Every structure is written in C-alpha cells, then in structure tokens.
C-alpha cells in the first residue's frame, strides 16, 4: 500500500534546486503573482504554485479557495471570471490573479515548476484543464496534490508526467483526530493509488513513520514545505529531505 512509484531518473534534476513558495513574494510582490514569479526566475529559483479554476473555466494561479485573505473580497475564486480576477488588487499591490497560461509564457522553461492541483469541495475539472494547458510546454515541471483523485486523472491522461503526493500531520488537527482516512493519508498508505515519484511533506513531519519507511525502503525523492529560514533548511536536509520549498528568506543555491 505504501509503495511509491518506481524511481524515474527524470526526477533527479528536481532534487538539485530550491523552490520559491508561490514565487519570491514580499510587501511589494503578491504571492502567486507574475511579479513574484518573475523575481524567482531572475534569481534562478524553481517555483511552487497553485492552480484552480475560475468561473469561466480558465486555469488561474491562486492558493486559497476564497478571496478574503488576498483580495479582501467576499466570495470564492470559482465565482469570478479570469478577467475579473486579474483586476483585483492582491495584498494591496498592483498584482492581480494571473492565468496559468500567462505564467507559462513568463517562465518559458527558465526554471522548473512544482504545480499544485487545488480541488476544493465539489470542484472538478482542475486536473483535466491542467493537462490541456500544459500540453506542449517544453519547460521542466512536476505536479502534486493533497488529493489522490487529482493525481489519478494525471495518470490516466499523462502517465509520463512526474507526480507527487502532498501530505502533513493531519491527525494533529482537531478536525481530523480519529479519522481513518486522514490517518492513511498522513502515513502515505494510499500511495498505491497514485504511485508518486516524490513526496512533498510538511517540515515538521520528518518523524512520521510512513515517511521514514518510504525514505529508507524506497529512496523516494522527498521535498519539504514551507521552510522559512536557513536554520530550518539545514534541519530539513539533516532529516533526509532532498530539497525545500521556501519563503521569507533567500537560500544559498
């Protein structure tokens, strides 16, 4: 059950670079914005980003399900068109919500991408749309999701794409305590569904037995998130993670 996919040599190069969490953002560059991605590209860092659908079926780059935190607007991303989202001010900056196509045009293969597929509630079609938009892109990228269902769609449509499962210590959260499903997800026991090429695990979860077992038994590539200092980065590497998704500091390359 816990066995990941067979090691693919294509995964090795993704372990050699560090990834800016939602781009290199700060008070002047909003997270998941073209300006944050442009800065990461300029500095030679890989980029982790999130994709979900707009009202008109466009793939847009945005983390949250709703717009409250980033735009101060009531409502969900899925309730607005891509054009409407592009005109919203994110975190008080001049940045709006970009489409994924715009991001691909901007990056143009310069740095690798980690693309997280967001599926909130009953939303569907995100993975399918990603497979459509990414077709023909020649830059380096991998996809990941907390939801095995999203990765199963990737496997069905594009088994060649490197894929990873996101996980965390779910059972520490009150809402998940005692949950069999989230216990299985925490310990990577649903790996058999998607045979991931890599595991992206939260930085505090290095002692989770499922993660330790995968690391020791299969040598699967391990990425951790979200590292916020050089000290945390050193600690993560010491615990067996191959590379990091970072924010709040500029790591050495």
What kind of feature is each model-predicted range?
Residues 1-253:
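Phosphate-group recognition and catalysis centered on beta-loop-alpha active-site segments
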């Amino acid at each position: 059950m816990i066995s990941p996919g067979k090691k693919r040599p294509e995964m090795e190069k993704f372990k050699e670079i560090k990834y800016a969490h939602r781009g290199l953002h700060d008070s002047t560059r909003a997270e998941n914005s073209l300006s944050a991605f442009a800065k990461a590209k300029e500095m030679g860092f890989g980029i982790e980003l999130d994709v979900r659908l707009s009202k008109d079926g466009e793939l847009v780059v945005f983390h949250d399900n709703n717009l409250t935190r980033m735009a101060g607007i009531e409502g969900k991303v899925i309730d607005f068109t891509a054009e409407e989202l592009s005109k919203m001010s994110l975190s008080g900056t001049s940045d709006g919500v970009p489409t994924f196509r715009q991001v691909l045009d901007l990056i143009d293969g310069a740095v690798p991408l980690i693309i997280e597929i967001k599926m909130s509630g009953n939303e569907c079609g995100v993975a399918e749309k990603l497979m459509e938009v990414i077709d023909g892109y020649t830059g380096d990228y991998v996809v990941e999701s907390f939801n095995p269902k999203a990765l199963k769609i990737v496997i069905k449509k594009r088994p060649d794409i490197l894929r990873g499962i996101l996980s965390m210590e779910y059972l520490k959260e009150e809402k998940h305590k005692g949950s069999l499903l989230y216990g299985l997800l925490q310990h990577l026991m649903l790996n058999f569904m998607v045979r991931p090429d890599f595991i992206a695990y939260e930085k505090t979860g290095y002692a989770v037995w499922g993660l330790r077992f995968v690391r020791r038994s299969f040598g699967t590539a391990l990425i951790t998130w979200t590292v916020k200092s050089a000290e945390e980065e050193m600690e993560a590497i010491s615990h067996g993670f191959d590379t990091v998704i970072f924010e709040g500091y500029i790591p050495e390359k």
